Regions:
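Intrinsic disorder/low-complexity detector
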Residues: 52-54, 59, 87, 91, ...
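Disulfide-stabilized, aromatic/cysteine-rich ligand-recognition loop
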Residues: 2-3, 7, 14-15, 19, ...
């Protein structure tokens, strides 16, 4: 559940929190500025995404410090500038982003809660739920790389990553241990209830 994850982060100490959407967006922009291509699985590495049956412990890339690391088997963790498992292994809950029942995209950077209360409505995400390879992104300046429409394949076009935007749901970022080519820095699944819990989310 996102509330449980939020509290666990706070319990780490003063200043700790879940990733919020604007921080995610900033990191995505840093990546695309540095590499100039959205297919991060070819630019950096697959991540822990291919035919794995369960999560593995974090820390697999500590030996690399803050250096970026990746490889091609899909059996090892990746790291981008010290951010381990930016995609692959388990998803991350993301705070400060919510798609309401009318598919309005609500974004906030403080006062995080389970209903999007007090968040800014930046625009409507569309007339129906959407999922698949991110072919087009929302046109609103603050929406970042949130999916607008899908098409093509994860290996050949668009953002090369999977996206979901479903009414009334919260986002999870990054891809799980068997996501395959749909994993990457832009994979954002807005398809999970605030009370949802599963192994691929950690809590």
């Amino acid at each position: 559940a996102i509330g449980t994850a939020r509290n666990l982060a706070k319990n780490m100490g003063v200043g700790w929190s879940l990733l919020d959407y604007y921080l995610v967006y900033a990191t995505q922009m840093l990546y695309i500025s540095e590499y100039g291509h959205p297919n991060a699985q070819t630019q950096i590495g697959r991540g822990f995404v291919d035919d794995n049956s369960a999560a593995i412990n974090t820390g697999g890339t500590l030996i690399n410090g803050n250096n970026t690391f990746g490889e091609t088997t899909g059996k090892k963790q990746m790291s981008y500038r010290g951010i381990e498992d930016w995609w692959g292994n388990v998803f991350d809950w993301i705070d400060g982003l919510f798609c309401d029942s009318r598919r309005n995209i609500l974004i906030g950077n403080k006062g995080f809660n389970n209903a999007g209360q007090g968040y800014e409505n930046i625009g409507n995400g569309g007339s129906s739920d959407v999922s698949g390879n991110i072919r087009h992104i929302q046109s609103y300046d603050k929406a970042g790389f949130i999916i607008k429409s899908s098409g093509g394949s994860y290996d050949n076009d668009g953002l090369y990553d999977a996206g979901y935007l479903d009414a009334g749901y919260w986002p999870r970022l990054g891809a799980g241990w068997s996501a395959g080519s749909g994993g990457g820095p832009f994979q954002l699944y807005g398809d999970y209830s605030a009370s949802g819990s599963k192994a691929s989310l950690g809590v």
